[in-house]
């Protein structure tokens, strides 16, 4: 089946899509000086996600981890602690899941341009841009929330993607694991798929004639 919609560029989210590994609050707790009890690990995890949106919008590493530490009743982390925290948090972005890599490879082989549209702190974005996988598979725009100061599902970040793509919305496809982010893309006439797993998305792409 041919791609009757003439898709030219496919944008992917990263976390929860290409990279399934999640941050490890147990490791964060250890670095900032808490024990590995369930209570402490849960406290750190809640603090991390309470400030994540602001971090994704461009908050500095120090500001973010100071906010997390403060929520845990701790003083500002040292420069060394911040470095370790950032490394622990961002290191998972060095590689994508193997099945996701095969999907990107197949799409590139089929002639599609691939881009990224993701909520992500600046340090993580740097890791992605310098990664082997991004240099190998991503030949379209890479839109990071921290670079534009806007997070999904705000329509502004999708407009940034449209401007960078230099294509009409009907030439694009967006894939994300969050239904509200998929809906936000569709409101701007960008076709979008909800990522449940790589096999399901492959089937969706086959139905669209893309694979």
Task: Label every PLM stretch briefly.
Residues 2-46, 187:
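Active-site neighborhood of HAD-like aspartate-dependent phosphohydrolases
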Residues 33-46, 73-86, 169, 210-211:
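Short, surface-exposed acidic
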Residues 26-27, 50, 63, 67, ...:
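Alpha-helical elements of Rossmann-like donor-binding domains used by nucleotide-donor carbohydrate transfer enzymes
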Residues 15-18, 51, 88-92, 121-122, ...:
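Short histidine/acidic/glycine/proline-rich micro-motifs that form metal-
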Residues 1-12, 117, 121-122, 126-211:
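Asp-based, Mg2+/Mn2+-dependent phosphohydrolase catalytic module
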């Amino acid at each position: 089946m041919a791609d009757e919609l003439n898709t030219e560029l496919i944008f992917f989210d990263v976390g929860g899509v290409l990279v399934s590994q999640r941050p490890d609050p147990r490791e964060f707790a250890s670095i900032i000086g808490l024990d590995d009890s369930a209570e402490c690990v849960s406290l750190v995890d809640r603090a991390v996600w309470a400030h994540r949106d602001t971090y994704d919008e461009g908050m500095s590493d120090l500001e973010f981890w100071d906010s997390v530490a403060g929520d845990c009743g701790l003083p500002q982390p040292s420069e060394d602690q911040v470095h370790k925290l950032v490394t622990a948090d961002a290191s998972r972005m060095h590689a994508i899941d193997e099945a996701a890599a095969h999907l990107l490879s197949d799409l590139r082989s089929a002639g599609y341009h691939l881009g990224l549209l993701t909520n992500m702190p600046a340090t993580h974005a740097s890791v992605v841009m310098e990664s082997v996988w991004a240099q190998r598979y991503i030949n379209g725009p890479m839109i990071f929330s921290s670079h534009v100061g806007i997070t999904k599902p705000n329509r502004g970040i999708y407009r940034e993607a449209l401007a960078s793509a230099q294509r009409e919305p009907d030439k694009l496809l967006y894939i994300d694991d969050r239904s509200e982010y998929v809906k936000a893309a569709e409101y701007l006439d960008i076709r979008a798929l909800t990522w449940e797993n790589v096999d399901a998305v492959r089937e969706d792409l086959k139905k669209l004639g893309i694979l």
